[in-house]
Curated annotation (Swiss-Prot):
It comes from Geobacter sp. (strain M21). Acts as a chaperone. Residues 600-640 are annotated as: Disordered. It comes from the Bacteria. The modification Phosphothreonine is found at residue 198. Induction: By stress conditions e.g. heat shock. This is Chaperone protein DnaK. NCBIfam families: PRK00290.1, PRK05183.1, prok_dnaK. InterPro entries: ATPase_NBD, Chaperone_DnaK, Heat_shock_70_CS, HSP70_C_sf, HSP70_peptide-bd_sf, Hsp_70_fam. GO terms for molecular function: ATP binding; ATP-dependent protein folding chaperone; unfolded protein binding. The keyword Phosphoprotein applies. Keywords: ATP-binding, Chaperone, Nucleotide-binding, Phosphoprotein, Stress response.
Length: 640
């Protein structure tokens, strides 16, 4: 089995790790950073920028720079959560044909799994560059409170990125794996995970290599992005009071506010006050306007007080579902960049009655846990058993619009449960199975995962036919449902891809497009490299012609000049092969010139090394050769 990488696909940042010599290693990207911004930008030239490159140009290209796409994954366009995002996003969120929330950039529509796949491709490439081999197998993490359609969409993103997703695991569970791998004692821990877009809390029991999740709860629409938005609104309101201009109407100014707000939030984790300076933020008839203000930690905490208060409910519910009190918890592990905020740490201490453990890196621990799970699946990590749970109850709609639960929340997965139902009317030829996920009593108040029909039921009075409905949740937390007429043995099943999910054909089409785009990227890179080498060759040749052109025949000189002209013409086009061919021709034509350069430098070296003794003269010649080598090394460097 090939190497398995662990990927933390985050709302704000992503991270990749792998097992090396029995230890998990976080891999730095091409820019030297151990985390990569989960951002994608579409440049005017058609080029796609991923990560730090995308983040750097976000201010000047806000409408075509996508971020926090994880908040849209597996969601319908008409949900309240998506409407909230539409109001604050500089990019366009649109309704897809399947009612999903998609994005539109430069006239092209993309699904959230497609955009997430671009981030995953960057993580895959980062791992491949480090390992020096092709990587196909991965473990990808998701928030514990992700529902079935969000998990399925994440798995689709992996497939589009060219990855074989061996397992989808919950972020808090991954963090617990990383924390508890070398712990020998039995303990009960709470993992408090507040990331860029989601909040999870999981209660686990650890002991003898067994990691058993007792309960999980959370909010998939509460995270750092919401804190940033509160800061943006505060800054914009203050500026409006002062200058009478609402910056929220200007997408470029809004992006600058977002960056400044995020920076201020980070700075206030270690200092009590920070300055926000944004010169030339906007202009009116009286001239340019500058934004200058101070933000204190106390003010930040007051404007985010509502969000901080919302962290308590899921923690209390998770404790209750686990049958534990706060005093039963031995350690509280902090995960996610937002847990660096002092007010968040204080809230955790208030809820659990103990100082949280800050011994793990909150940005990297989830990817490390995913890599460990990859090691378990590959057989490299022994004596580790992970028992995860399903975060939400699953059931079907029954007579009167009621949700009848078959699998309760916090059931250990994988699991299977069957129940026998019957028809609601006489001679009913078919039953429609409406699959739901959620905790509300009425079906309409829960999330629809899918619908399917079992037909061909023989005529019989109502209540007579025996229809067995079976729910099966796999280790990824993805649901399979079947219905069987026990009288006839007829069966119908569905693998839930959610009514708003991508079809198999759509996923395969996106895989092909991603592969084609990777090939385009390779061609673009080859063209850029060929142009750079050609530019350097022209520069070196023209420089040598100026200095040594009189040392060669006029006919040779003309050939070189013609070669330079031909290469310059090839550079006007975008055919890498033509440029390479013209470069080779110029190099062939330049041989005589290279000899003249060599002879000149050789002569200079020999003159400078005249000595009274024979041996010294030989040494001088050697020294001259070294000078020549260095000269040629310099030419090579220029060509690179």
């Amino acid at each position: 089995m090939s190497r398995v990488i662990g990927i933390d696909l985050g709302t704000t940042n992503s991270c990749v790790a792998v097992m090396e010599g029995g230890e998990p290693v976080v891999i730095a990207n091409a820019e030297g950073s151990r985390t990569t911004p989960s951002m994608i930008a579409f440049a005017e030239s058609g080029e796609r920028l991923v990560g730090q490159q995308a983040k750097r140009q976000a201010v000047t290209n806000p409408e075509n720079t996508l971020y926090a796409i994880k908040r849209l994954i597996g969601r319908k366009f008409d949900t309240e959560a998506v409407k909230k995002d539409i109001a604050i996003s500089p990019f366009k969120i649109v309704k897809a044909d399947n009612s999903d929330a998609w994005v539109e950039v430069r006239g092209q529509k993309y699904s959230p799994p497609e955009i997430s796949a671009m981030v995953l491709q960057k993580m895959k490439k980062t791992a491949e560059d480090y390992l020096g081999e092709t990587v196909t197998d991965a473990v990808i993490t998701v928030p514990a409170y992700f529902d079935d359609s969000q998990r399925q969409a994440t798995k689709d993103a992996g497939k589009i990125a060219g990855l074989n997703v061996l397992r989808i695991i919950n972020e808090p569970t991954a963090a617990a794996l990383a924390y508890g791998l070398d712990k020998k004692k039995d303990e009960k821990i709470a993992v408090f995970d507040l990331g860029g877009g989601t909040f999870d809390v999981s209660i686990l029991e650890l002991g003898e290599g067994v990691f058993e999740v007792k309960s999980t709860n959370g909010d998939t629409f509460l995270g750092g992005e919401d804190f940033d938005q509160k800061i943006i609104d505060h800054i914009a309101d203050e500026f409006k009071k002062d200058q009478g201009i609402d910056l929220r109407g200007d997408k470029m100014a809004l992006q600058r506010l977002k960056e400044a707000g995020e920076k201020a939030k980070c700075e206030l984790s270690t200092s009590l006050e920070t300055d926000i300076n944004l010169p030339f933020i906007t202009a009116d008839a009286s001239g340019p306007k500058h934004l200058t203000m101070k933000l204190t930690r106390a003010k930040l905490e007051s404007i985010c007080a509502e969000l901080i208060a919302n962290l308590e409910g899921p923690c209390r519910t998770a404790l209750k579902d686990a049958g534990l009190s706060a005093s039963d918890i031995d350690e509280v592990i902090l995960v996610g960049g937002m847990t660096r905020m002092p007010i968040v740490q204080k809230k955790v201490q208030d809820i659990f009655g103990k100082v949280p453990n800050r011994g793990v890196n909150p940005d990297e621990v989830v990817a490390i846990g995913a890599a460990i799970q990859g090691g378990v699946l590959r057989g490299d990590v022994k004596d580790v058993l992970l028992l995860d749970v399903t975060p939400l109850s699953l059931g079907i709609e029954t007579l009167g619009g009621v949700l009848t639960k078959l699998i309760d929340k916090n059931s250990t997965i994988p699991c299977r449960k069957s129940q026998v139902f019957s028809t609601a009317a006489d001679n009913q030829p078919a039953v429609s199975i409406h699959v739901l996920q959620g905790e509300r009593e009425m079906a309409a108040d829960n999330k629809t995962l899918g619908n399917f029909e079992l037909s061909g039921i023989p005529s019989a009075p109502r209540g007579v036919p025996q229809i067995e409905v079976t729910f099966d949740i796999d280790a990824n937390g993805i649901v399979h449902v079947s219905a069987k007429d026990l009288g006839t043995g007829k069966e119908q099943s569905i693998r839930i891809t959610a009514s708003s999910g991508l079809s198999k054909e759509e996923v395969e089409k996106m895989v092909r497009e991603a592969e084609a785009h990777a090939a385009d990227d390779k061609k673009k890179r080859e063209l850029i490299e060929a142009k750079n080498q050609a530019d350097n060759l022209i520069y070196q040749t023209e420089k040598s012609l100026t200095e040594f052109g009189d040392k060669i025949d006029a006919s040779e000189k003309q050939k070189i000049e013609e070669g330079v002209a031909a290469l310059k013409k090839a550079l006007e086009g975008s055919d890498a092969d033509e440029i390479k061919k013209a470069s080779d021709s110029l190099m062939q034509a330049s041989h005589k010139l290279a000899e003249a350069v060599y002879a000149k430098t050789q002569g200079a070296g020999a003159e400078g090394s005249e000595q009274p003794h024979g041996e010294q003269e030989a040494g001088g010649a050697a020294k001259g050769e070294t000078v020549v080598d260095a000269d040629f090394e310099e030419v090579k460097d220029d060509k690179k």
